[in-house]
């Protein structure tokens, strides 16, 4: 029994499969809740996810599966600006996913990579190689193709047209918020020496009071609105999806570390690029989305862009490793 469990724990294919499943699960469950009839309590959804995340990693820690540092007030004070940025990022992400289909959301999310790359050039002395630049051009092209595919479908209705561009507004805001979050968090991690689960613990713990306060202040908690957000015919399924999406966020983090441990960072980066294809396709399978030549083409162009970017980053890492020995 122990040998079979050890074999699973050290299996590359199983770790890769688990990472892909957890990524798809979180995206699909979020979309299920957010695309519900007139769902408008995004802050509540995000608060529930953060609470579930804290409970889950706390349980895993008690069983000795993971470890993270104890709560420290001074560390929490220093980390609080990151938590605020996280709230902005996940809220704008939820709003974008509410209005856009999963394939379009996934494709436009690639544009965040461009902002982060040039942010690293400005703040950390990074560089953008020719191959990386080529992947950026492919990302922009895939986004234009996705926009054209959505435009072709939504052009007939005024309401859907407004909702579409509202989705693009939230997506653009999310790209900038995500880039700011990643870049500033990277700088803070270097100062605090946080590990993955330390980061997850503080991010979610500090986000909970912000999200709950925002929900109470900005969202309608009347009985009528709660009935709209949680209709009796699918109330249980909606709540279950909210809880499941919170647990799957832990799964993504755990499976990421698992995948890197039993394979390599190179394999993991390739899996991250390849995983965009099944996530985007899951949106076409599980939800009503624009299915035409342009929407399908944009998925595969975006997939190719992610693949080219992963290869570019691998080559750059190899060059960086070989630099000290060349001196």
Swiss-Prot record:
It is found in: Golgi apparatus membrane; Cytoplasmic vesicle membrane; Endoplasmic reticulum membrane. InterPro entries: TPT_transporter (IPR050186). It is a multi-pass membrane protein. Keywords: Cytoplasmic vesicle, Endoplasmic reticulum, Glycoprotein, Golgi apparatus, Membrane, Sugar transport, Transmembrane, Transmembrane helix, Transport. GO terms for cellular component: cytoplasmic vesicle membrane; endoplasmic reticulum membrane; Golgi membrane. The chain crosses the membrane at residues 5-25, 37-57, 79-93, 103-125, 132-149, 164-184, 208-228, 239-259, 267-289, 293-312. Glycans are attached at residues 158, 234. Residues 1-4, 58-78, 126-131, 185-207, 260-266, 313-327 are cytoplasmic. It comes from the Eukaryota. Residues 26-36, 94-102, 150-163, 229-238, 290-292 are lumenal. Its main location: Golgi. Involved in the import of GDP-mannose from the cytoplasm into the Golgi lumen. PANTHER family: SOLUTE CARRIER FAMILY 35. Belongs to the TPT transporter family. SLC35D subfamily. Homooligomer. This is GDP-mannose transporter. The gene is VRG4.
